[in-house]
UniProtKB/Swiss-Prot annotation:
It comes from Xenopus tropicalis. It is an enzyme of class 2 (transferase). The lineage of its organism: Eukaryota, Metazoa, Chordata, Craniata, Vertebrata. This is Protein N-lysine methyltransferase METTL21A. The keyword Transferase applies. S-adenosyl-L-methionine binds at W47, G73, A74, G75, D94, W125, A141.
Length: 215
């Protein structure tokens, strides 16, 4: 998730994001996520798309036990934390500026005997991808929103995906450009809208690389 600096405009409708922390319960764990809108902006608060994806992972029988998982644009790290609590080996990523913030949330919410299954790494989409391998699951919550990042995000998906990889994208489709990105993905991936939460207007999309004969 891109780091956007704090501005005063429009934040009155986003009062909950100004709380220094947010509490949740997933996988029978009480999770306390620190937030820092003022310093890190949209990357440092919990958005609806992250909550919907966490609920989906827990309630829809997604088998993450011992799977390799990477979260892109992790922001607060909530999705990656829940994936780890579900038994996955998780790499939680965002830009360099978010690293210490992410590590703090991971340390606060992952049991000490499970910390070895979680790594926090900087990943700028489209750059230094050779440092990363493929993963069983690639997760992203509200990462489809800056059009200038779309080519790099698509390149990152392609690098991280094998034929068996599953991408789960949770997003509120606010603008035409969001739909356009999904169309870009369809050139390389099969995509299905697998879940819709009407209360938050958030969709979850499941994507997998097309078989070579389909390209």
């Amino acid at each position: 998730m891109a780091l956007v600096p704090y501005t005063d405009s429009g934040v009155q409708s986003l009062k909950r994001f100004h709380d220094s922390s947010a509490s949740f319960k997933f996988v029978n764990h009480n999770i306390e996520i620190k937030q820092d809108w003022k310093q890190l902006g949209v990357a440092a608060v919990v958005w609806d798309a992250a909550l919907v994806l966490c609920m989906y992972l827990e309630s829809e029988g997604i088998h993450l036990q011992n799977s390799s998982v990477i979260e892109l644009g992790a922001g607060t790290g909530l999705v990656g934390i829940v994936a780890a609590l579900l038994g996955a080996q998780v790499t939680i990523t965002d830009r360099d500026l978010a690293m210490e913030f992410l590590r703090m949330n991971v340390r606060d919410n992952i049991p000490k005997d499970s910390l070895h299954r979680v790594s926090v790494r900087a990943l700028n989409w489209g750059k230094s991808l050779e440092e990363f391998s493929t993963y069983d699951f690639i997760l992203g919550a509200d990462i489809i929103y800056l059009e200038e990042t779309f080519p790099d995000l698509l390149q990152t998906f392609l690098h991280l995906s094998s034929q068996q990889s599953v991408i789960l994208l949770s997003s509120r489709l606010r603008y035409q450009r969001d739909h356009d990105f999904l169309e870009m993905m369809k050139l390389h991936f099969t995509i299905a809208d697998v879940y819709y939460d009407k209360n938050t207007d958030v969709h979850i999309f499941r994507a997998q690389l097309r078989q070579r004969k389909e390209l």
